[in-house]
A protein has these predicted regions:
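N-terminal donor/sugar-recognition subdomains of glycan-related enzymes
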Residues: 2-241, 248-265, 274-278, 285, ...
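Short beta-strand segments
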Residues: 89-90, 245, 313-315, 379-380
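Glycine-rich phosphate/pyrophosphate-binding loops
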Residues: 113, 273, 281-290, 368-392
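Short, acidic/turn-prone active-site loops that include or flank metal/cofactor-
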Residues: 113-118, 270-273, 288-295, 316-318, ...
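Extended, hydrophobic alpha-helical segments in both membrane/secreted and soluble proteins
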Residues: 266-272, 286, 312, 361-364, ...
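Active-site-proximal structural scaffolding
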Residues: 269, 305, 315, 357, ...
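Active-site/ligand-binding-proximal alpha/beta "capping" segment
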Residues: 320-374, 379, 383
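Active-site phosphate/oxyanion-binding loops
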Residues: 388-421
Length: 483
């Protein structure tokens, strides 16, 4: 039961002034809707002695307002004087932020709050409009933050640039009651900062190899069809795309895939291609983005007539052995570029660009989006080890390269299982791929009318996807043969 608080006209004006300065629309509307609060305002003799009493359990926001404020200020002026960005969990009475922002080195103070009644009261008491308007004070409600927020925030200036000095400070002991929310928030921020750092590349030799192979592949790129042509000819030609990856769950899906293959557009990973050939299931597209020679070996074969009408779509800095093997028996291929400064300078714009993500499955998924498929069905996308420790489907040609990996990763990357069926063991790389997928899926569902079905029936849960049996997808989405 909330207490009706009576604010005088000047306090109401102050609240409106603060609200006007707030750029976060969701928080702005949420604050306007509050009419009462469980908190009681406690004012001491000192102007800075502003406390709140939580009447639901008779606890206070601060045990000693002035002492805690001075202690925090001393710590921050001593240790963090030059930090461009500071992070707090809990708005408290807000006085600390006004004091810290006197220091011009602090470009932003980012405050996460779960209980916005605290902000509602303090916006009636103190003027934060200047700090809010300049965005030096950023206030965020934890329940409103989605995957897209974390992805955008952790990759934007100056937060990304100073991600190495990130730490989250509790405003006061009162906020310890939200420990689960604090830990979850911290985990997401740390993970997304890591993902953003990795997305910029973490190996200069890898980058140089990419540039070298891109230059080597240039003659092949400009003498084969362009990405622009692909979009103009094939955009929107079928509703449903099935993306075939090489997880342990793939084996059980192959008979059904074979039965319905003519009714969907099939995108497959380079590693799935020899497996589909073995089972005589013809994909429409085979994609590859790795720059190592081992991946090229998936194409060191000759499946004869099977390869007719398959289009091999390669990232423009794959290893040159890939194009050599494809040319050897006249397979149809094209090279497509991602966004990269070096590539953009060459102005070969017809041959790009699309963001391909970290894995060939991400690349398949994003190409399917650009080709305007309305339903995207994932199979073999486990992103986790099988119960017996297998990393990939039994037909996968490089299984021996992953021996011992299950033991190496056990209990380090545990995650929610598909179908909410307990937990599964994942790896560092798969966790990265999964986060990449989850970010893309959430953006797609927000801005496009595309449905993403995870029909792997095993492995890790990919948040945001619709989990359905593969049989359901085949029976409900695939009705007629494609020409």
């Amino acid at each position: 039961m909330g207490l009706m608080m009576t604010f005088i006209p000047t306090q109401k004006e102050l609240f409106n002034k603060n609200i006007e300065a707030l750029s976060n629309l969701f928080l702005k509307e949420s604050l306007k809707e509050i009419k009462s609060s469980k908190f009681e305002l406690i004012l001491g003799k000192d102007n800075l002695d502003i406390n709140l009493k939580d009447t639901s359990d008779n606890t206070f926001l601060y045990e000693n307002v002035i002492d805690e404020l001075n202690s925090m200020l001393n710590t921050y002026n001593d240790k963090y004087l030059l930090y461009p960005v500071l992070y707090f969990y809990g708005f408290g009475n807000g006085i600390l932020f006004k004091a810290l922002l006197q220091n011009k080195n602090h470009q932003h103070i980012v405050v996460f709050e779960k209980d916005i009644e605290i902000i509602w009261i303090m916006f009636h008491i103190l003027d934060f409009s200047h700090e809010l308007q300049s965005a030096r004070l950023m206030v965020l409600q934890t329940s409103s933050l989605d995957i897209e927020f974390f992805s955008n925030f952790c990759s934007s200036k100056p937060f990304f640039q100073f991600s190495r000095i990130y730490f989250l400070e509790l405003m006061s002991h009162y906020y310890e009651r939200f420990h689960e929310d604090v830990l979850e928030l911290n985990k997401k921020l740390v993970q997304d900062f890591k993902d953003s750092i990795l997305s910029h590349g973490n190996d200069p030799l890898d980058a140089l190899q990419g540039i070298e192979q891109f230059v080597y592949n240039l003659p092949q790129m400009i003498t084969h069809p362009s990405y622009k042509e692909l979009l103009s000819k094939r955009k929107g030609i079928s509703d449903t795309a099935i993306i075939v990856s090489t997880g342990p769950s793939l084996t059980k899906q192959l008979p059904l895939l074979k039965k319905y293959a003519s009714k969907a557009t099939i995108f497959c990973a380079d590693s799935s291609y020899p497996i589909l050939a073995k089972h005589n299931i013809k994909p429409d597209y085979v994609l590859s983005l790795e720059r190592i020679p081992l991946t090229s070996e998936f194409f060191n074969n000759d499946f004869g007539e099977f390869d007719k009408d398959i289009l091999f779509v390669l990232k423009s800095y794959v290893h040159p052995h890939t194009t050599k093997y494809l040319q050897k028996n006249n397979r149809n291929f094209m090279l497509v570029s991602t966004y990269a400064s070096f590539i953009n300078y060459l102005k070969l714009d017809d041959f790009g660009y699309f963001n391909m993500g970290f894995s060939v499955a991400n690349m398949n998924f994003l190409l399917a989006i650009h080709l305007k498929h309305k339903n995207i069905v994932l199979i073999g996308q486990d992103l986790a080890y099988a119960k017996d420790g297998l990393s990939h489907t039994k037909d996968y040609s490089n299984l021996d390269k992953h021996e011992g990996h299950f033991q190496r990763d056990k209990n380090k990357y545990t995650t929610q299982a598909y179908g909410d069926n307990g937990k599964v063991e994942s790896s560092f790389v798969w966790t990265l791929f999964r986060h990449n997928f989850e970010q893309d899926v959430q953006k797609i569902q927000k801005y496009l009318d595309t449905k993403v079905y995870n029909c792997t029936e095993g492995g890790a849960r990919i948040e945001g996807t619709i989990e359905k049996p593969f049989l359901w997808a085949c029976e409900n989405l695939l009705h007629k043969d494609l020409n």
